[in-house]
Amino acid sequence: MASLALNTQADPEIELFVKAGSDGESIGNCPFCQRLFMILWLKGVKFNVTTIDTARKPEELKDLAPGTNPPFLIYNKELKTDFIKIEEFLEKTLAPPRYPHLSPKYKESFDVGCNLFAKFSAYIKNTQKEANKNFEKSLLREFKRLDDYLNTPLLDEIDPDSTEERTLSRRLFLDGDQLTLADCSLLPKLNIIKVAAKKYRDFDIPAEFSGVWRYLHNAYAREEFAHTCPEDKEIENTYASVAKQ
């Protein structure tokens, strides 16, 4: 196991367990692990991160969380294992005024990218080369939907008293200029798609999707995302056996 601590102030005792990389120490490829990692970082709470080598589960893990794979969390000595419930718990418990709310204001911010990863998975696992174009088209349709949403101004961006009509959004992220739970869910998956689809399908997100690229550029500039991403090789290794070229 490898541990690192992120210190800010006196807080609850929190330890997040995430999947380790191929070296057994670094951060591994697990979008759900990264999702919780980002949430805790954005909350501004003090917490420890421990990487778990799932290939060689340490003895202490068998006692701590038998039959459980990362991510899981210990909050004030209480084990929590369902990542969706963990997310809900953290949003409810680490709340204002001390900690920021991360829930998005607009429901579509959560919904808009919900099919992207499934389309990518079908594309990367396809074994019939002649069908690749159809799978790619399905993936591109989902990227177009995301791009349209990111380029369409939210209600918060529209000034009813202005004589200028804003036709193109300038916001940084899905729900505005702050990262939210919606970004914590989508961004780890987008990073996987960008890396694995390029490696095994020579697929690049088209430059014409300016909203998607603006979003990714802004996201990689934030340490809460960039510093929780696995190395590209970890993503490539994950898909090496399933990507039928």
UniProtKB/Swiss-Prot annotation:
GO cellular component, one term: membrane
Signal sequence, start to end: none
Domain (GST C-terminal) ranges: 76-239
Motif (G-site): 30-33
Parts of the chain that traverse the membrane: 32-52
Location in the cell: Cytoplasm; Membrane
One term of GO molecular function: glutathione peroxidase activity
Keyword terms, alphabetized: Chloride, Chloride channel, Cytoplasm, Disulfide bond, Ion channel, Ion transport, Membrane, Oxidoreductase, Transmembrane, Transmembrane helix, Transport, Voltage-gated channel
Enzyme Commission number(s): 1.8.-.-, 1.11.1.-
Entry-linked InterPro entries: CLIC, CLIC_N, Glutathione-S-Trfase_C-like, Glutathione-S-Trfase_C_sf, Glutathione_S-Trfase, GST_C_CLIC-2, Thioredoxin-like_sf
Catalyzed chemical reaction(s): chloride(in) = chloride(out); tert-butyl hydroperoxide + 2 glutathione = tert-butanol + glutathione disulfide + H2O; cumene hydroperoxide + 2 glutathione = 2-phenylpropan-2-ol + glutathione disulfide + H2O
Subunit structure: Monomer. Interacts with TRAPPC2 and RYR2.
Protein name in UniProt: Chloride intracellular channel protein 2
Native source organism of the sequence: Rattus norvegicus
Gene from which this protein is expressed: Clic2
